[in-house]
Design a protein with these regions (language model features):
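Glycine-rich phosphate/diphosphate-binding loop of Rossmann-like nucleotide-binding domains
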Residues: 6-27, 135-208
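Buried hydrophobic positions in well-ordered alpha/beta secondary-structure cores of metabolic enzymes
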Residues: 11-14, 65, 119, 157, ...
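N-terminal alpha-helical transmembrane segments of multi-pass membrane transport
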Residues: 13, 30-45
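Buried hydrophobic packing segments
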Residues: 21, 25, 189, 282-290, ...
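N-terminal small/polar loop signature for handling phosphorylated ligands or for N-terminal nucleophile
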Residues: 39-59, 186-222, 227
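Glycine-rich phosphate/nucleotide-binding loop
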Residues: 43-46, 55, 212-314
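N-terminal glycine-rich phosphate/adenylate-binding segment common to multiple enzyme folds
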Residues: 44-140, 230-234
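Glycine-rich phosphate/pyrophosphate-binding loop and the adjoining helix
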Residues: 52, 129-171, 175-178, 296, ...
Length: 341
């Protein structure tokens, strides 16, 4: 029986990237029924409202087993709706954003090979959306940190290390300044860590870690780096720069019984319709979706085929040093994946 998955095509280059991903998923005969859901900045520009996600789309998202989301644009400025991703994370209680970051054979490695995983608490912190304008000259934002989400994201990090056979985790804080919120977070981490005696955990202040990951990134290979929402949003983006292109970085958001899969990059509206951008991240997000739905062989075929196409370098996009179009790279991955099953 086919799985039901909510599909958000997104803004800018999102629809093209999703089309390329669907082509690859069809090539491996993925047993998925996609339910298309309107959402994003372009939809909001046309229809207005207080949310980037209309009510009908919410119903489909809630009734699906999972969600595959293309990149979306979030409007800036006071009074505009919150992002699609943050809204779904909070609404579906997707407390852990996981971003694997690994260099690919055949690509530039600015500071050598890297292979680690970033885990980010995805529902609270400074992204809770609790902000107030007190006057024309004063605005405040609340950093909400609570025990249960902190324990859940710590458990996710330790479980991810355990699953991969890794022995190290690094918790990112600024506890010397944020003495209450980060103290609570680290207390939750230590509580959970008692259940993982074979995995070490080391606390790093965010400013020091941001420097150390550039000075010696290999020191953190085969480890899981985790922390609160804003800190890990910034750190995971920094670490992603150690890979040839942000177009290769994919991610997933997990709750207890739901998950959303997406590329880690933005919608790149200036490239909309040009068939130009790198489809790797969206395709690998689609592969991870299949793994989540227990179609592991098909997922593995896509992962290996994507790595092979990138390593060959003949059908890759401009950011990887090639001349292929988005659709041509997706075609190459799809053709190889269908043969690898």
């Amino acid at each position: 029986m086919a799985h039901t998955v909510a599909l958000i095509r997104g803004d800018g280059t999102g629809p093209e990237l999703v089309d390329g991903t669907l082509k690859v998923l069809r090539a491996v005969d993925a047993e998925v029924d996609f339910v298309e859901c309107d959402a994003g900045f372009e939809w909001w520009q046309a229809h207005g409202g207080s949310s980037l996600i209309p009510p009908d789309s919410w119903k489909n998202i809630e009734s699906a087993e999972a969600c595959l989301k293309g990149p979306t644009t979030t409007p800036a400025g006071s009074g505009t709706p919150g992002s699609v991703a943050v809204t779904i994370r909070q609404g579906m209680h997707l407390y852990a954003n996981i971003r694997p970051i690994k260099t690919f054979e055949g690509t530039r490695r600015p500071l050598g090979d890297v292979n680690l995983v970033c885990v980010r608490e995805a529902t609270e912190g400074l992204y809770s959306g609790i902000e107030h304008r007190l006057s024309n000259d004063v605005a405040i934002a609340f950093r909400k940190i609570t025990r249960i989400p902190s324990e859940k994201v710590a458990k996710t990090a330790f479980e991810e290390a355990k699953r991969r056979g890794w022995k190290r985790c690094f918790a990112i804080t600024k506890q010397n300044i944020l003495k209450e919120t980060d103290a609570l977070f680290m207390d939750a981490v230590r509580t959970v860590h008692k259940n993982y005696p074979n995995i070490s955990v080391e606390e790093y202040f965010i400013d020091n870690f941001a420097q150390q990951i550039i000075k010696n990134p290999q020191r953190f290979n085969e480890s899981v780096v985790f922390g609160t929402n804003l800190f890990m949003d910034i750190i995971s983006e920094e670490i992603s720069a150690l890979v040839a292109s942000i177009g290769c970085i994919y991610s997933a958001n997990f709750g207890d019984d739901y998950a959303m899969f997406e590329p880690a990059h933005g919608s790149a509206p200036r490239y909309k319709g040009l068939d130009k951008v790198n489809p790797t991240a969206t395709i690998l997000a689609g592969a991870w979706l299949l793994e989540y739905l227990h179609e592991e062989k098909k997922a593995d075929a896509i992962f290996k085929s994507t790595e092979a196409v990138i390593a060959e370098g003949r059908k890759v996009t401009y950011d990887l040093g090639g001349t292929a179009k988005l659709s041509e790279m997706a075609d190459a991955i799809a053709q190889r994946a269908s043969k690898n099953l």
